[in-house]
UniProtKB/Swiss-Prot annotation:
The lineage of its organism: Bacteria, Pseudomonadati, Pseudomonadota, Gammaproteobacteria, Enterobacterales. Involved in the regulation of the intracellular balance of NAD and NADP, and is a key enzyme in the biosynthesis of NADP. Catalyzes specifically the phosphorylation on 2'-hydroxyl of the adenosine moiety of NAD to yield NADP. This is NAD kinase. Gene3D superfamilies: Probable inorganic polyphosphate/atp-NAD kinase, domain 1 (3.40.50.10330), Probable inorganic polyphosphate/atp-NAD kinase, domain 2 (2.60.200.30). One of its GO terms (biological process) is NADP biosynthetic process. It comes from Buchnera aphidicola subsp. Schizaphis graminum (strain Sg). GO terms for molecular function: ATP binding; metal ion binding; NAD binding; NAD+ kinase activity. Its EC number is 2.7.1.23. InterPro entries: ATP-NAD_kinase_N, ATP-NAD_kinase_PpnK-typ_C, NAD/diacylglycerol_kinase_sf, NADK. Its main location: cytoplasm. One of its GO terms (cellular component) is cytoplasm. Keywords: ATP-binding, Cytoplasm, Kinase, NAD, NADP, Nucleotide-binding, Transferase. The keyword Transmembrane helix does not apply. NAD(+) binds at D73, G74, N147, E148, H158, R175, D177, T188, G189, Y190, S191, L192, S193, Q247.
Amino acid sequence: MKQYFNCIGIVGRPRHSTALITHEILYKWLIKKGYQVFIEYNISKKLNLKNPKTATLIEIGRLCDLAIVIGGDGNLLFTARILSYFNIKIIGINCGNLGFLTDLNPDNKFKKLSEVLSGKYFVENRFLLDVMIYKKEQVSKSSIAINEVVLHPKNVAHMIEFEVYINDNFAFSQRSDGLIISTPTGSTGYSLSAGGPIIETSLESILLVPMFPHTLSARPLLIRSDSVIRLRFSDIETDLKISCDSQIVLPVKKKEYVFIRRSNYYLNLIHPKSYNYFETLTSKLNWSKKFF
């Protein structure tokens, strides 16, 4: 039988014994099927396996053509920010809460994985966001995000002032608790909680969602994904932060400004052929069922 994947990496950040057991069972299942399998080095030390092949995340990105992430969406976000720099496909087994990205149910994971490994899958290329903090025309800090980039104050419930430029054109100024700049992937995350719309993941767009703005006229704004966003701040602003996927935090100092744009890198997320995005929304968000 043709092998669509030759080398597979198993990654995750397990916090519960059930997730650790899933790592062990999956490793043995893949080895039995004849695949070359690497387990992320930090996880392997916690598993009861005899001489498994181990690798760092970067090594998995270089060596493997498929990474299986075991955990919740947070695990996949952490992993994908590194693996997106490599030509590797990613699929997730949900051991967390919602599981918008890790869409394989642990109860039927082997059935769905068998479909994928036999070539019955499709690829979604989810774009990322680059964020760069500039000081005197030089990049002082940078990162990437899959879900969203969030501007917020260091202190909770502290209003800030900023201006937003899109493609070097002034768009709006705002007094608010911050601003969420989201990808379509992130539209079911933080921005949804802030009143933003859900964006179908194949749409090439970026979403700007105000956080508790001090005006009723402030509304979410959807722009083209090839737009370049620049954030400027008044000289009195101090202790501002930029958060990427709620996992990486970059401080913004006085006289610094922020650029956000679509990255050249993608998350190569794969799904079984039977995957249905709207079915996922219905089940995860408890939407109404069909009438007929």
